[in-house]
Amino acid sequence: MGFFFSTRKGLLLIIFICLDIFGSNAQLLPEDEVQTLRTIFRKLQNQTVNIERTSCLDRKWNFVAESTSKLPTSNITCDCTFNASSVCRVTNIQLRGFNLRGIIPPEFGNLTRLTEIDLVLNFLSGTIPTTLSQIPLEILAVTGNRLSGPFPPQLGQITTLTDVIMESNLFTGQLPPNLGNLRSLKRLLISSNNITGRIPESLSNLKNLTNFRIDGNSLSGKIPDFIGNWTRLVRLDLQGTSMEGPIPASISNLKNLTELRITDLRGPTSPFPDLQNMTNMERLVLRNCLIREPIPEYIGTSMTMLKLLDLSSNMLNGTIPDTFRSLNAFNFMYLNNNSLTGPVPQFILDSKQNIDLSYNNFTQPPTLSCNQLDVNLISSYPSVTNNSVQWCLRKDLPCPGDAHHSSLFINCGGNRLKVDKDEYADDLNKRGASTFSSVSERWGYSSSGAWLGNDGATYLATDTFNLINESTPEYYKTARLASQSLKYYGLCMRRGSYKVQLYFAEIMFSNDQTYSSLGRRLFDIYVQGILLERDFNIAQRAGGVGKPFLRQVDEVQVNGSTLEIHLKWTGKGTNVIPTRGVYGPLISAITVTPNFKVDTGKPLSNGVVAGIVIAACVAFGLLVLVILRLTGYLGGKEVDENEELRGLDLQTGSFTLKQIKRATNNFDPENKIGEGGFGPVYKGVLADGMTIAVKQLSSKSKQGNREFVTEIGMISALQHPNLVKLYGCCIEGKELLLVYEYLENNSLARALFGTEKQRLHLDWSTRNKVCIGIAKGLAYLHEESRLKIVHRDIKATNVLLDLSLNAKISDFGLAKLDEEENTHISTRIAGTIGYMAPEYAMRGYLTDKADVYSFGVVCLEIVSGKSNTNYRPKEEFIYLLDWAYVLQEQGSLLELVDPDLGTSFSKKEAMRMLNIALLCTNPSPTLRPPMSSVVSMLQGKIKVQPPLVKREADPSGSAAMRFKALEHLSQDSESQVSTYTRNKEHKSSSSMDGPWVDSSFSDPSKDVSLLQQEEGNSSSSSRRLLDDLTDVEIE
């Protein structure tokens, strides 16, 4: 009894103690929430957290994080005001940087008072659980995980949300329209995902937004006009979204903006947006937005708080405003890659801030040496013969001495080292925000761009995570990186062909199961202005982080004395993992070696020395005679026909007529390889052994030599793997010559329609590759290049094939040389019957959709192996295209596939290509897709849903009459082609043993109005063709 008595007293004592501690109003977590929290942490694979009913009071949650490069942050907040302060409820859960694994537990939906979930920088997968729509959530932050799947539509049901922060994940698909229900939303941060499609119109309802970031996604459509509704917006980020311009005028309503970042827009050029009321602006980035205007004066007067200004890679002209002297707060200014003129203001030159003015057209250059300049002015002044201008300031970086180097080895971001027999130069300059450095006479680099959110980030990287294997070359352990643009230059290089090797290894992300492994680095690679890689991902191409990858280019031509390697960030990938400022281009090492035999340096024989002396004497004598003649002392002074070209900044190589005559054996007919609407083409071999193609243009161009050279310079800047490369030009007397790369396999027309001896019998994979190549080339001309070009004459004869049967478009930009005005209504039709879009052929209405139509015809020819203009299966069908529409209605499109292929082709790909061809040849230009979409369709990335054009829904009705008009158009158009042209076409089709000859319909002596007068009443039906065709029923 005594034992039981004492035990009872002990129990009572414990009870009294507990009551004394907690009282009658003990603030405890309900048992159901305790169990819910334990389940959540078990599923998050963190077993160390201690969850008790008393945890809200003693706050002993016992969080333990794995080793990580960033200090983790944890916080669980309770509200204990429920039921007269006797019950606690969890309201906020913050677990940042714990590398939590697994999925986001759906049990979060059982915490009925939870208003915040912050799981930033972990290693979570899966998607957002639907159960979250059951709770009054206000903040959802999951940036820096590996969450995936369609963007969660259930978020649109949580109308209490004020902050949605989901950057740097893997969400896909379009934004759900019901996000417009979140009228309390203040922050919507969804950058660096894989979101596609348009920004939904319903988001116009989000009038409380203060921060909207969607950069680094692959969106479509234009920047919506309704962003002007977001008048409370403080920050707007639209970097690298692939959206179309222009920036809408409604943006002027956003008077509270402090940060505006819009980059890499597609579409037409546009004026500078009206931002003058944004007086609180601190960071303004409008990079590559196709803006063609002077810089507004108000930037210097209204935006006095500006810290960062980036207007690079536009088409800005005029001078730098004097009002910029009032920008006392700025740290970074980027006006590079524009067309600015005039002298650089002295207050800019005296500034010690980061300023990049490279690649402009300034005058009055400074006298400082290249390495004394604090402002990056590389390649910003015309190439002139005045040697007082520093070489680094002049276009194309001409060699200040003899161009004698033939190799280059750089350990980017690392020390000098020797690998095998090669000595790699060190590259340790720590500057990079706006820097040009010519480390030696052999090479230099230019770096540009400020880091997002981390001005102090480094420009040199080391193998922080010890990823590089000891057996891997040492240069992979270091790297140079840049936030935006990184260029390396090989200087004073000999002319000729080189092999370029670029060495990469991702050394800034880890290879473990932590958030530090989740970074994605994407950038573009150009060599000599030619795009080699778009959205290049080092880790992906190498098969993991810390693994080496070599990108090699076997033939790179140096025609001047400079070789340029350009790595460029376009706003894609992540920029917060493992810390802010880890993104942008990165490279470990560069090697450049010659493809030609290099002089060994052995001493010259006496005979060779004597020959050199004699040759020098002869040359000097000739020079004296030339000077005497030009000054009038010998035969009088003659006017130099090309005097107006002196001092011009030629953006392309210059050839002499003597060089070209020697190369082509004086334009020997045996070397003639083709003839088109712009003149004959000859094969030639230069003295250094390089094979070229020379196009002999008509000398009747309406433009003067200066304008001609300007246009050619602009065309030569258009460089893409699927465009024929323009090496240069020659203008002497009446000769206008263009020098192109030589393509060994001639034209696509010859490969498909030539004689049995000439045809290449292309297999299906090659046809598919050729079709995609043409589409990529046109997409570049229309949407990606700075100079937007409509080709006007896309056809099989204007597509050439190299040794590997890669397609390259020729004659791009040449129709522009005969233009007098730049308007949508072209009075001079340049094209070929059977390939011209109806609105262009009949009305002269010219847009890039005319090229889309022509591409559709060529695509049809590639699949069928038949010429659109020569193949008529039945008398009532005018073109192959006409027959294709019939087969489409009958469901028999595959009958068009070239019988030579037999069964060796993909039916799925063939149907895809044929449907795309019909989609592109839609009579209505507005229903034809842009070429970038065509590329995606051909690659199977997006579905093809071509509209069906009904020909014979009512054989006696209007539809049949509309297609009958197409026959009248063909007959009328053929009557307009000169007898000479028809004779040439007849010759090309009947005699295929010689060079492939083709003619375009381009008659400069007759404009549209004259042609219409000559037609008279007999062709009234075809003049109404456009009106007829646009009424064709579309399903």
From Swiss-Prot:
Q: Where is the composition biased (Low complexity)?
A: 1009-1023
By sequence similarity, the record places it as follows: Belongs to the protein kinase superfamily. Ser/Thr protein kinase family.
Q: Where in the cell is it found?
A: Cell membrane
- Major place of residence: membrane
Native species of this protein? Arabidopsis thaliana (Mouse-ear cress)
PROSITE patterns from the xrefs? PROTEIN_KINASE_DOM, PROTEIN_KINASE_ST
Q: Which InterPro entries match?
A: Kinase-like_dom_sf, Leu-rich_rpt, LRR_dom_sf, LRR_Rcpt-Like_S/T_Kinase, Malectin_dom, Prot_kinase_dom, Ser-Thr/Tyr_kinase_cat_dom, Ser/Thr_kinase_AS
- Which residues are reported to be glycosylated? 46, 75, 83, 110, 194, 208, 229, 256, 277, 317, 337, 361, 386, 469, 559
Q: What is this protein called?
A: Probable LRR receptor-like serine/threonine-protein kinase At1g53440
A GO MF term:
protein serine/threonine kinase activity
Residue span(s) of domain Protein kinase: 667-948
What GO terms fall under cellular component here? Answer: plasma membrane
Its domain of life reads Eukaryota
Quote the catalytic residue positions: 793
Record keywords: ATP-binding, Cell membrane, Glycoprotein, Kinase, Leucine-rich repeat, Membrane, Nucleotide-binding, Phosphoprotein, Receptor, Repeat, Serine/threonine-protein kinase, Signal, Transferase, Transmembrane, Transmembrane helix
Each LRR repeat, start to end: 87-110, 111-135, 137-158, 160-182, 183-206, 208-232, 234-254, 278-302, 303-326, 328-349, 350-372
Stretches assigned to the Extracellular side? 27-607
Q: Does the keyword Ribonucleoprotein apply?
A: no
Q: Which residues carry this modification: Phosphotyrosine?
A: 740, 840
Catalytic reaction list: L-seryl-[protein] + ATP = O-phospho-L-seryl-[protein] + ADP + H(+); L-threonyl-[protein] + ATP = O-phospho-L-threonyl-[protein] + ADP + H(+)
